[in-house]
Design a protein with these regions (language model features):
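Class I S-adenosyl-L-methionine
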Residues: 1-222
Length: 222
């Protein structure tokens, strides 16, 4: 995977122990991403540092998963902490094919990420029903209309909401970490413990994240 780097074990208060995969911002992002030129968190430190380093890196994803298995007790991989699944505004088939093959070869490792270009990914033939059970790619959407379209295509989605008390659809759950922070209390879980975004048992549950003043969360930003 060109323009891609990985950290087999990273740990912070929100995510808990996870492996992170970084891609170059811009060239791997869809031109339709509304945050690309205004507020993309991946252009801010410290994520920007990893994204810049990824420019010169090539990641062997299967070998990376072997390293994750050895070093990461959670065996959870978060894709696209920076960047997306594109190259020059087209679906990066080399990336997707290697990702899917590696996921199938390592069913004990949970892999998840978000894309701002689910329609192009879907049109390219990479639909949710073609992903193995341990791989979840969520549609990152910016409004309820796009969320409805993603759901109609069979995609699990993540969207943002300004108010954690706002009414959500029956198949939506507010991120418990964001909800706790909105109430001014310490979250009682981490992403690694929660698993709402990626565990197979939650495959029909869509996620709502908190709108952040000065810029929206992107892809469930940590």
């Amino acid at each position: 995977m060109k323009g891609t780097s990985g950290t087999p074990l990273s740990d912070n208060r929100k995510t808990g122990p996870m492996a992170n995969v970084y891609r170059t911002v811009g060239v791997t992002c869809p031109s339709t991403c509304p945050l690309l030129e205004r507020g993309c968190y991946a252009k801010r430190w410290p994520v920007a540092l990893h994204a810049k380093r990824a420019q010169e890196k090539t990641l062997d994803f299967n070998a990376f998963l072997q390293e994750v298995r050895k070093k990461n007790p959670s065996k959870i991989v978060r894709l696209n902490v920076s960047g997306d699944v594109f190259v020059n505004d087209e679906v990066d088939r080399e990336f997707m094919d290697e990702l899917i093959a590696a996921a199938k070869a390592n069913p004990d490792i949970l892999i998840y990420g978000y894309t701002h270009g689910f329609e192009k990914v879907h049109a390219a033939g990479y639909t949710p029903d073609t992903f193995p059970a341990n791989l979840t790619l969520l549609a990152s959407v910016d409004d309820k209309d796009t969320a409805a379209k993603a759901a109609a295509y069979g995609w699990k989605y993540a969207r943002v909401e300004r108010d954690y008390t706002a009414k959500t659809d029956e198949d939506e759950v507010f991120c418990p970490i964001d909800a706790a922070k909105s109430k001014g209390i310490e979250p009682k879980t981490t992403c690694a413990e929660c698993k709402l975004c990626f565990a197979e048992k939650y495959k029909n549950v869509n996620i709502v994240f908190q709108y952040v003043t000065g810029g929206r969360k992107k892809k469930g930003g940590a």
